[in-house]
A protein has these predicted regions:
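Extended, composition-driven regions rather than compact fold-specific motifs
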Residues: 1-229
Length: 229
């Protein structure tokens, strides 16, 4: 658990399955005492011993509404907990907090992730639109999930996912950018989330392209053999 003394009672207002493995949940509660920035995470207690953090797609303190997209991969207690959620369920929401946040001073933003990153990417996209900033989103997804971004109004390039070569298609896509585009986007803020190995490889590529380390914000959501990073 990473948030101490920041617990707010919430109730599940409604749920919707965009796909058998992609569930949207809207939570409602008094969030007026909280402060949210795009990119921050919230946390739920999912069992007596387990906590899981998620990045909201929408968080509105004034209206008391929080929306989360859950990737139901079926591999752990977090997935099972999210699948069981239904209207009327009550729980405590912890946060928001975490080290990732929208870099307001920048006008160019690039988000990378996978199925576990949809909420983060949508939240950052909507923030960028509101600011009039330029935004690009790259997602490595299983082929059967390539339609997911469109289903949730996320403008993203869906790329193939490889177990053996993490982020390979995303790296090839970035390396194919013409020099003129790199000159324009080299000072961008890069938000890297999802699989730890993919983040490591993308980060290495960006550094080799001359992107400064302070422009790269990372948040690994999962890694092989580890439960709930």
């Amino acid at each position: 658990k990473v948030f101490n003394g920041m617990m707010n009672p919430v109730e599940v207002l409604q749920t919707h399955y965009y796909h058998p493995h992609l569930k949207w949940v809207q939570f409602s509660g008094d969030l007026s005492n909280t402060k949210f920035e795009a990119g921050k995470v919230i946390e739920f207690r999912i069992s007596d011993t387990d906590f899981r953090h998620y990045t909201p797609a929408l968080y509105d303190q004034a209206k008391g509404i929080c929306e989360v997209f859950f990737y139901l991969h079926g591999y752990g207690p977090g997935s099972a907990w999210a699948d069981r959620l239904e209207a009327g369920d009550q729980m405590k929401l912890m946060g928001p907090g975490g080290r990732m946040s929208y870099q307001e001073a920048n006008n160019y933003h690039v988000c990378f992730g996978d199925e576990s990153s949809l909420g983060l990417c949508l939240n950052l996209q909507n923030k960028a639109k509101g600011q009039g900033d330029s935004f690009q989103c790259l997602l490595e997804l299983e082929e059967k999930h390539h339609t997911w971004p469109e289903l949730i109004s996320l403008q993203a390039r869906s790329l193939g996912k490889s177990e053996a070569f993490p982020a390979q298609e995303a790296i090839e896509f970035l390396e194919a950018w013409p020099q003129q585009k790199w000159q324009q986007w080299q000072e961008a803020s890069f938000y890297l989330s999802g699989r730890a190995k993919s983040i490591q490889r993308i980060r290495k590529t960006l550094l080799a392209k001359g992107v400064h380390t302070k422009q790269i914000i990372t948040f690994p959501y999962w890694a092989e053999g580890k439960k709930g990073l």
